[in-house]
Design a protein with these regions (language model features):
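Short aromatic-glycine-(Arg/Gly/Cys) micro-motifs in beta-strand/loop hairpins
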Residues: 7-36
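Intrinsically disordered, low-complexity boundary segments flanking structured domains
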Residues: 1, 26-29, 45-48
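Short, mixed-charge low-complexity intrinsically disordered segments
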Residues: 39-74
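Short, ordered beta-strand-loop transition motifs
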Residues: 5, 34, 63-65
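Mixed-charge, polar/low-complexity N-terminal
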Residues: 1, 21-23, 40-41
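Accessory DNA-engaging acidic/polar modules
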Residues: 3, 13-16, 33, 47, ...
Length: 74
């Protein structure tokens, strides 16, 4: 069970009080949400850092199973 919780943790991008959901199709705009449950998540640190850098956001660790959110520290 503990291993399942660890694998459920993903990196998400937060900018201000909003979380990145994704890019709007056929547009160069991005969709944002106030809920981390809506956020795009990845376990690929390099990809997450690239997206956060491009959008001016910060990386956060998010575990939707446990409902835990905390700032990512390299």
């Amino acid at each position: 069970m503990n291993n399942y919780l660890r694998k459920a943790t993903v990196l998400i991008v937060k900018r201000g009080a909003e979380y990145l959901v994704g890019r709007i199709p056929y547009s160069m705009e991005f969709r944002w949400s106030t809920s981390p449950y809506d956020a795009w998540g990845t376990r690929d640190r390099e990809k997450a850092e690239a997206v956060a850098g491009k959008l001016g956001g910060d990386l956060w660790l998010w575990n939707p199973v446990a409902g835990q959110l905390r700032e990512y520290a390299n």
